[in-house]
Regions:
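Bacterial N-terminal signal peptides
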Residues: 11-21
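Residue-level detector of conserved, function-critical positions
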Residues: 23-194
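Intrinsically disordered, low-complexity segments enriched in polar/charged small residues
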Residues: 9-12, 78
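Bacterial N-terminal signal peptides that target proteins for export
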Residues: 2-10
């Protein structure tokens, strides 16, 4: 029964990996996934391609490894997010309330009571988006972020120095892909920008 549950979870993860890899075809590359998370009871096991457990931890929520780092949420009552390496060791401590995966060498993190900050893989602060309500991972050197203006969310794009490249004037937006991003104007009409 337990083996069937683990195989079912593994099948679901593998199916989602197929879909996830297909999304990366747009950028012309398929990412190799070296370790896959599966849950067994309260433990998250990271297994390799030979179905061998590399390490485990009590993590209720995890990510796949991206740029050799995975995001994990601790199981404590006041759960926090940190980043682990391929051996399961924390490379950045679990002190964040929210975080994104690393992409293009950077991730966004939020400490309790603070604004989103961009960090590198060493945990060094690159910049803070003081007015941002949300921020996504980098795509083509730009990250989509939102601010609240007169009760409404507005979306714009920031570069890796923290400078706004495209002002937050859109009522909806998507990340850049192949040099273009879908955006929605104030009238609700969608189009593309480059």
């Amino acid at each position: 029964m337990v083996a069937r549950k683990v195989k079912y979870c593994m099948g679901a993860v593998l199916a989602s990996l197929f879909v996830f890899s297909a999304c990366n075809l747009q950028s012309g590359r398929i990412e190799t996934v070296s370790l896959i998370p599966v849950w067994y009871g309260d433990s998250c096991l990271y297994i390799n391609a030979e179905d061998k457990v590399e390490f485990s931890g009590l993590y209720p929520s995890v990510s796949l490894f991206r740029e050799d780092i995975a995001l994990v949420q601790t199981a404590e009552r006041d759960a926090r997010i940190g980043f682990i390496d391929n051996s399961g060791e924390f490379v950045l401590p679990a002190v964040y309330k929210q975080a994104t995966i690393f992409r293009e060498g950077m991730a966004f993190v939020v400490r309790p009571g603070e604004a989103p900050c961009a960090i590198n893989q060493k945990g060094e602060l690159k910049f803070t988006l003081r007015d941002a309500e949300s921020v996504e991972t980098y795509h083509e050197d730009m990250a989509l972020y939102s601010v609240r203006e007169k009760g409404k969310l507005r979306y714009g794009y920031v570069d890796k120095r923290g400078e706004t490249i495209i002002d937050p004037v859109y009522s909806g937006a998507m990340s850049f892909s192949q040099g273009k991003a879908a955006v929605r104007d104030a009238k609700g009409k969608w189009g593309f920008i480059d």
